[in-house]
From Swiss-Prot:
Disulfide bridges in this chain: none
Keyword Phosphoprotein applies: no
Motif ('HIGH' region): 42-51
Family matches, as InterPro entries: aa-tRNA-synth_I_CS, aa-tRNA-synth_Ic, Rossmann-like_a/b/a_fold, S4_RNA-bd, S4_RNA-bd_sf, Tyr-tRNA-ligase, Tyr-tRNA-ligase_bac-type, Tyr-tRNA-ligase_bac_2
Biological role: Catalyzes the attachment of tyrosine to tRNA(Tyr) in a two-step reaction: tyrosine is first activated by ATP to form Tyr-AMP and then transferred to the acceptor end of tRNA(Tyr).
Assembly information from the UniProt record: Homodimer.
EC class: ligase
Ranges of residues in domain S4 RNA-binding: 336-396
Entry keyword set: Aminoacyl-tRNA synthetase, ATP-binding, Cytoplasm, Ligase, Nucleotide-binding, Protein biosynthesis, RNA-binding
EC number: 6.1.1.1
Motif 'KMSKS' region: where in chain: 226-230
Protein name listed in UniProt: Tyrosine--tRNA ligase
């Protein structure tokens, strides 16, 4: 096992906040594998790279010799996490949750080592909890403390309804840490209240309090808003290798380093060497290719990554991407047809030219041929090619 200092450096890489660092150091000094917990509510079947920020950190803990608990919130998934929500979320059925959970498991083991992962379902203990135990759990916290949460406070102050079951979500998430005797819990920055609940409940149940590690919400391909399928600025981990590759090599240069830190398993020394190369005049696209190949290989294999790179090169053979690829930002109230985007960005002379190119296969988005039915999502960024020589990286921003 690495030294405490080496472990702490890797644990803190890319993290937003570590509470409490001194407590974690004491846990690490014992030289025993820690129990590292992260919970995921299977409310949607498909994961994107934003979800993998936590999973990547779990893998780093595994590589340090610790025990990872991948908690599937099949019970909490039927409640619906109210974090950051301005309205009550409709709960899912048990069947929907379990179906999504199976899909989750098949996806996360492309990152986690199955032999070093304990998969748990919080229905295992919550379904067995009787009325007396449940009352004991709810007595650990007050309504006044619950209303300290920003989202609950905003809804309460604006007379928006808050269902009683929504108060139960952070309590159940916190109790998961009691049931699993977690030493460390990971979560997004929007989960801090729930993670702190775990610390408080563990003390209430006579356990040593867990440390919490919050990870940032990954920016989407536009580099502005958080990655989200609904915003169209995402990279799904089950997307085809070529699509995944094309999206990653088209991200803004400044965003590349953020993705390296949170998504790559390369050492920070290697990443800093890449930065030095770019500062010395290297083409940022060459570095983005390394990032894209690494991530595609993780989910699809080395051969698929090599094929995606080769195919992208073949698609661009009639006009290599220029080093000074134009960056164009458009503003729109809603998603736009690709023809309108090309016209507004100036890649075509007029709407008629856009229609002709789309009809003849002369328009590519991230290297893939598209037709007139292609819709450009607000919040997304793509490399567009109209004809043989007109290229631009176009971001469609919301008004």
């Amino acid at each position: 096992m690495k030294s405490v200092e080496e472990q702490l450096a890797l644990i803190k890489r890319g993290a937003e906040e570590l509470l409490v660092e001194s407590e974690l150091i004491e846990k690490l000094k014992r030289g025993e594998p820690l129990r590292i917990k992260a919970g995921f509510d299977p409310t949607a079947p498909d994961l994107h790279l934003g979800h993998t920020v936590l999973i990547n950190k779990l893998r780093q803990f595994q590589d340090l010799g610790h025990q990872v608990i991948f908690l599937i919130g099949d019970f909490t998934g039927m409640i619906g996490d109210p974090s950051g929500k301005s309205a009550t979320r409709p709960p899912l059925t048990r069947e929907q949750v379990l179906e999504n959970a199976e899909t989750y498991k098949s996806q996360v083991f492309k990152i986690l080592d199955p032999a070093k992962t304990e998969v748990a379902f919080n229905s295992t203990w919550m379904d067995k909890m009787g009325p007396a135990d449940f009352i004991r759990l709810t007595s650990q916290y007050t309504v006044a403390r619950m209303l300290e949460r920003d989202d609950f406070d905003k809804r309460y102050s604006t007379n928006q309804p808050i269902a009683i079951h929504e108060f139960l979500y952070p309590l159940v998430q916190g109790y998961d840490s009691v049931a699993l005797r977690a030493d460390v819990e990971l979560g997004g920055t929007d989960q801090k209240f729930n993670l702190l609940m775990g610390r408080e409940l563990q003390r209430g149940y006579g356990q040593e309090a867990q440390c919490i590690l919050t990870m940032p919400l990954l920016e989407g391909l536009d580099g502005v808003k958080k990655m989200s399928k609904s915003l169209g600025n995402y990279v799904g981990i089950q997307e085809a290798p070529g699509v995944m590759y094309g999206k990653l090599v088209s991200i803004p240069d400044a965003l590349m380093w953020r993705y390296f830190e949170l998504l790559s398993f390369r050492s920070m020394d290697e990443i800093n060497a890449f930065k030095a190369d770019v500062d010395a005049g290297a083409n940022p696209r060459d570095i983005k290719i390394k990032l894209a190949e690494e991530i595609v290989a993780r989910f699809h294999g080395e051969e698929a990554a090599a094929n995606a790179h080769r195919a992208a090169g073949n698609r661009m053979k009639d006009g290599e991407l220029p080093d000074d690829l134009p960056e164009i930002e458009l503003v729109a109230a809603e998603d736009m047809p690709i023809a309108a985007v090309l016209n507004k960005a100036g890649l075509v002379k007029n709407a008629a030219m856009a229609r002709d190119l789309l009809g003849s296969g002369g328009v590519r988005v991230d290297g893939e041929v598209v037709d007139r039915t292609y819709i450009y999502a607000v919040g997304s960024t793509h490399v567009c090619q109209a004809g043989r020589k007109a290229f631009a990286r176009i971001t469609l921003k919301s008004e």
